[in-house]
Amino acid sequence: MKKFMLALLLCASGSAFANSACDTPRNDFDGLYCLNKVYQEADKELNDNYKKLAAKLDANGKQSLKSSQLSWISERNQSCSKKDSSGFYVNLDCATSTTIKRAQFLQDRYRECTSSGCQNSKLQ
């Protein structure tokens, strides 16, 4: 647990350092670039957690995880984006916070698998 917290702290401080140039974006496009970087980091963590968890699951668990993930993606897209006649819009703050929450959910399920055994019923 101490190693995990240290790794989390190092990642957070490294991430904060990398994003320090984004603290005061000069214009909206710089701000969008910075928000996208944060989203990409969250999405990478989500995908890493998904793969780690899937590797621990039996066939039924993998199917439940896949179904749950596809449902989550659909909900995220519906909540954080919209399309109208003038274009397609994504609320990156919504997408990022939703992705971080899902990554944490997957990490929690992975920890359960490694400590007390995988519970497929908790994957939904």
Kindly label every feature range from the protein language model.
Residues 6-8:
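Sec-dependent N-terminal signal peptides
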Residues 11-17:
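N-terminal signal peptide c-region/cleavage motif recognized by signal peptidases
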Residues 10-11, 83:
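Short, linear, compositionally biased motifs with a strong N-terminal bias
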Residues 17-124:
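N-terminal alpha-helical modules
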Residues 1-4:
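Positively charged n-region of N-terminal signal peptides that target proteins for export
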